[in-house]
Amino acid sequence: VLVRAATTWGGLRACATAYQLLSHAELPSFCRIEDQPRFLWRGLCLDVARHFFPLPTLLQVVEGMALLKMNVLHLHLTDDQAFRFASPGWPALASEQHYSRQQLEQLVAFGSARGIRIVPEIDMPGHVNHWLTAYPEWGLHPVAPTDRFGVHPACLDPTREVVYRALNVLLQDVAEVFPDEYIHLGGDEVSPDWWQQSEAITQFMADNGMASTQDLANYFLQRLVAITQGLGRKPVAWDEVLHPDMPTCLVQNWRGVTTRDQALQLGQDCLVSAPFYLDLNYPADVHYAFDPSADQQSQILLEDQSLEDVRLQHVAQGMAWTRMWREGAVDLVEPLGGASVLGGEACLWSELVDPDTLPTRLWSRLPAVAERLWSSASCRQIDHLYERLEGCWETLSPHPYTHQQQRLAGLGLS
């Protein structure tokens, strides 16, 4: 086997291809493969807040991603239920189950050796119920701890300078552990009612000419981006941060294709995640059909077809929200300022996923997303997708169906 590559990372990806090829029982007598990635950002967002995944599990995830030629593990470290990062500046934030600095540095080094960047997410100003149990002065009033999943209304108070001083310390702690050029700042599912109930906040908005809580959220983002850039990092945030006056920020799209094009029209680079939610029980071919750079009408057609897919009727009601976000659709002629889709991320939210069920949810479909992000737009071999998946599964550890096999064995079945 002869491997030629222009970079170390290219050599790693070529070795992954060779490993997959050599894992098959029947090998061609001769073959030549010329390959390169289509997108720069080929990632997985893993929620470690709702359920905690120990370090050995994360290392297995990185190994599998390397075999799939992916290159970004986005760790959703914080949420309403838990805070998995140990901040020296704010030690009360850390949940009982959290990652030590040594563990995270080990993960970063392990990923780097395999061409996998580790991008941390500290989600704010919403999804901070756990924060406010530790430091109630950052919000409007104390809140009770919760392990119930779903959207909780508690938010940071963006009018208090003490909040920005705290975030400067926290993000500095994050930057010292994670060397990647990006820090994900969250920004999703902010409850306007939480801010509107405060006379002090509504007065602040009036004094500063803010017509809506979206303007207030954008003020918070501007302050947060300034802190992030001051640390020599670039910001990423979920697509709720879209605003005509938003600062430069890599936007992660999750609310349907229209927010992707809104970001591009504002001159913001974009990551696509909307069609790649692995915690939902979609067949792999549904994920595979979506092209991150396809035109808006093609994407909307696929969304509508998914709503009618008989295999998805068990989640059809939940999928209907994709139509709600079309209200802001734009006719994108040319992205502003050369903005582009940098790639995409599959997302695995862990409300109903734990270390035992992770292999099934992750490896059964992530290879399909990985191929979509790596291969050219003309690669549409959907008829043989499941044959390719079966071949890929044999190279992954643990096998996607390990959990089911163990449960069946416990029942005396095979």
Task: Name what the model sees in each region.
Residues 8, 40, 89, 130, ...:
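Residues in intrinsically disordered, low-complexity segments of regulatory proteins
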Residues 76, 83, 91, 185, ...:
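Residue-level signal for alpha-helical context at structural boundaries
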Residues 83-84, 127-130, 193-195, 245-246, ...:
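Extracytoplasmic/secreted cell-surface and envelope-processing proteins
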Residues 106, 161-182, 203-414:
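Substrate-binding groove of N-acetylhexosamine-processing glycoside hydrolases
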Residues 124-126, 188-192, 241-243:
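Short, internal active-site loops enriched in acidic
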Residues 188-210:
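N-terminal leader/propeptide and maturation segments of large enzyme subunits in energy/redox metabolism
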